[in-house]
A protein has these predicted regions:
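Amphipathic alpha-helical segments that line or abut small-molecule/effector binding pockets
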Residues: 18, 41-49, 125
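Amphipathic alpha-helical segment in the mid-to-C-terminal domain
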Residues: 40, 70, 116-120
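Mid/C-terminal beta-alpha module of Rossmann-like enzyme folds, strongest
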Residues: 46, 53-100, 135-136
Length: 136
Protein backbone atom coordinates (compact mmCIF):
# COMPACT_ATOMS: atom_id res chain seq x y z
CA UNK A 1 0.00 0.00 0.00
CA UNK A 2 1.11 3.51 -0.74
CA UNK A 3 0.14 6.30 1.66
CA UNK A 4 0.63 10.02 1.30
CA UNK A 5 2.30 11.79 4.21
CA UNK A 6 4.87 9.06 4.84
CA UNK A 7 8.52 10.09 5.01
CA UNK A 8 10.67 8.59 2.28
CA UNK A 9 13.12 7.33 4.91
CA UNK A 10 10.42 5.30 6.68
CA UNK A 11 9.14 1.90 5.69
CA UNK A 12 5.65 1.98 4.35
CA UNK A 13 2.72 1.72 6.73
CA UNK A 14 1.75 -1.89 6.05
CA UNK A 15 5.36 -3.09 6.42
CA UNK A 16 5.64 -1.26 9.73
CA UNK A 17 2.37 -2.79 10.99
CA UNK A 18 3.36 -6.32 9.94
CA UNK A 19 6.92 -6.06 11.30
CA UNK A 20 5.70 -4.86 14.70
CA UNK A 21 2.96 -7.51 14.84
CA UNK A 22 5.50 -10.25 14.07
CA UNK A 23 7.64 -9.07 16.98
CA UNK A 24 4.57 -8.52 19.18
CA UNK A 25 5.47 -4.85 19.56
CA UNK A 26 2.47 -2.58 20.21
CA UNK A 27 1.53 -0.62 17.10
CA UNK A 28 0.94 3.10 17.68
CA UNK A 29 -1.73 4.46 15.36
CA UNK A 30 -3.77 7.63 15.22
CA UNK A 31 -7.56 7.41 14.93
CA UNK A 32 -7.54 11.07 13.87
CA UNK A 33 -5.06 10.62 11.01
CA UNK A 34 -6.98 10.12 7.77
CA UNK A 35 -5.32 8.71 4.69
CA UNK A 36 -6.31 7.47 1.25
CA UNK A 37 -4.33 4.28 0.63
CA UNK A 38 -3.66 3.26 -2.94
CA UNK A 39 -2.14 0.07 -4.25
CA UNK A 40 1.14 0.21 -6.12
CA UNK A 41 -0.60 -1.63 -8.99
CA UNK A 42 -3.25 1.08 -9.25
CA UNK A 43 -0.61 3.83 -9.21
CA UNK A 44 1.39 1.96 -11.87
CA UNK A 45 -1.73 1.74 -14.06
CA UNK A 46 -2.23 5.51 -13.70
CA UNK A 47 1.42 6.21 -14.56
CA UNK A 48 1.25 4.01 -17.65
CA UNK A 49 -1.92 5.72 -18.79
CA UNK A 50 -0.37 9.16 -18.21
CA UNK A 51 2.66 8.27 -20.34
CA UNK A 52 0.31 7.33 -23.18
CA UNK A 53 -1.56 10.65 -23.03
CA UNK A 54 -0.12 13.66 -24.86
CA UNK A 55 -2.92 15.95 -23.70
CA UNK A 56 -2.16 15.81 -19.97
CA UNK A 57 0.72 17.87 -18.58
CA UNK A 58 1.62 19.02 -15.10
CA UNK A 59 1.88 17.64 -11.61
CA UNK A 60 -0.90 15.32 -10.50
CA UNK A 61 -1.74 13.59 -7.26
CA UNK A 62 -3.24 10.11 -6.98
CA UNK A 63 -4.62 8.14 -4.06
CA UNK A 64 -7.31 5.66 -3.20
CA UNK A 65 -10.97 6.56 -3.62
CA UNK A 66 -11.80 6.46 0.10
CA UNK A 67 -10.40 7.80 3.35
CA UNK A 68 -9.60 5.60 6.32
CA UNK A 69 -7.92 6.42 9.61
CA UNK A 70 -4.64 4.77 10.62
CA UNK A 71 -6.26 2.70 13.36
CA UNK A 72 -8.86 1.18 11.03
CA UNK A 73 -6.26 0.62 8.31
CA UNK A 74 -3.87 -1.17 10.69
CA UNK A 75 -6.78 -3.28 11.93
CA UNK A 76 -7.71 -4.25 8.36
CA UNK A 77 -4.10 -5.11 7.47
CA UNK A 78 -3.72 -7.35 10.54
CA UNK A 79 -7.11 -8.93 9.92
CA UNK A 80 -6.17 -9.63 6.29
CA UNK A 81 -2.90 -11.19 7.51
CA UNK A 82 -4.88 -13.67 9.60
CA UNK A 83 -4.04 -12.16 12.99
CA UNK A 84 -6.62 -13.05 15.61
CA UNK A 85 -7.80 -10.16 17.81
CA UNK A 86 -6.03 -7.40 15.83
CA UNK A 87 -7.23 -4.69 18.24
CA UNK A 88 -4.99 -6.13 20.96
CA UNK A 89 -1.94 -4.98 18.95
CA UNK A 90 -3.13 -1.41 18.40
CA UNK A 91 -2.59 1.62 20.63
CA UNK A 92 -4.42 4.85 19.76
CA UNK A 93 -2.07 7.85 20.05
CA UNK A 94 -4.50 10.45 18.71
CA UNK A 95 -4.40 12.37 22.02
CA UNK A 96 -0.66 12.93 21.47
CA UNK A 97 -0.65 13.41 17.71
CA UNK A 98 -3.90 15.26 17.06
CA UNK A 99 -5.89 15.53 13.86
CA UNK A 100 -3.97 14.92 10.62
CA UNK A 101 -5.55 14.75 7.19
CA UNK A 102 -3.64 13.53 4.16
CA UNK A 103 -6.66 13.67 1.86
CA UNK A 104 -5.84 14.25 -1.80
CA UNK A 105 -8.04 15.93 -4.37
CA UNK A 106 -8.33 13.49 -7.26
CA UNK A 107 -10.67 15.67 -9.34
CA UNK A 108 -7.99 17.03 -11.70
CA UNK A 109 -7.41 13.48 -13.00
CA UNK A 110 -10.46 11.48 -11.98
CA UNK A 111 -12.59 12.22 -15.04
CA UNK A 112 -9.69 12.27 -17.50
CA UNK A 113 -8.42 8.72 -17.01
CA UNK A 114 -9.85 5.30 -17.74
CA UNK A 115 -8.07 3.97 -14.65
CA UNK A 116 -10.21 4.51 -11.56
CA UNK A 117 -9.09 5.04 -7.99
CA UNK A 118 -9.75 1.89 -5.97
CA UNK A 119 -11.87 1.77 -2.83
CA UNK A 120 -10.33 0.43 0.37
CA UNK A 121 -11.66 -3.12 -0.07
CA UNK A 122 -10.18 -3.44 -3.56
CA UNK A 123 -6.92 -1.86 -2.45
CA UNK A 124 -6.59 -4.30 0.45
CA UNK A 125 -7.36 -7.26 -1.83
CA UNK A 126 -4.15 -6.44 -3.68
CA UNK A 127 -2.25 -6.82 -0.41
CA UNK A 128 -1.48 -10.53 -0.56
CA UNK A 129 -0.37 -12.77 2.25
CA UNK A 130 0.64 -16.14 0.88
CA UNK A 131 0.29 -17.76 4.30
CA UNK A 132 -0.80 -16.61 7.76
CA UNK A 133 1.58 -14.24 9.48
CA UNK A 134 3.93 -16.01 11.88
CA UNK A 135 4.37 -14.29 15.22
CA UNK A 136 7.58 -14.50 17.26
Amino acid sequence: LILGGTKISERNFNQKVITKARKRIPIKVNKLCNRQPASSNNIADVLIELTQRNDLHGIYHWAGAEEINEYELAFEILNRAGISNPKSYLIDVSADKGNLNFRMDLNPLRNKLKTKALNIDKTLKELDFKEPLELN
